[in-house]
Amino acid sequence: MKVVLLECLVWMMAMMELVSCECWSQADCSDGHCCAGSSFSKNCQPYGGDGEQCEPRNKYEVYSTGCPCEENLMCSVINRCQSA
């Protein structure tokens, strides 16, 4: 039973690694994505679409909880993307 649980855990970690792309800066991410996360674990995440969580753009391009919004959208005071 322990072996099965360990195999499941390893499989889940491998899948998470495939889905997310680790990054150190914006330059590590492809177009339409930003580098966001904690100081120890940042991943390339897509820019926010209409109604999705966001962080306002900043000159340092440092984001912790999510990316800025896609073009033509703005990040509202409640951190949701909406029409500009």
Curated annotation (Swiss-Prot):
Disulfide bonds join C23-C35, C29-C44, C34-C67, C54-C75, C69-C81. GO terms for molecular function: toxin activity. The keyword Thylakoid does not apply. Expressed by the venom gland. Keywords: Disulfide bond, Secreted, Signal, Toxin. Its main location: secreted. It is found in: Secreted. GO terms for cellular component: extracellular region. The keyword Acetylation does not apply. Residues 1-21 form the signal peptide. It comes from the Eukaryota. Gene3D superfamilies: Lipase, subunit A. Belongs to the AVIT (prokineticin) family. This is U8-theraphotoxin-Hhn1a.
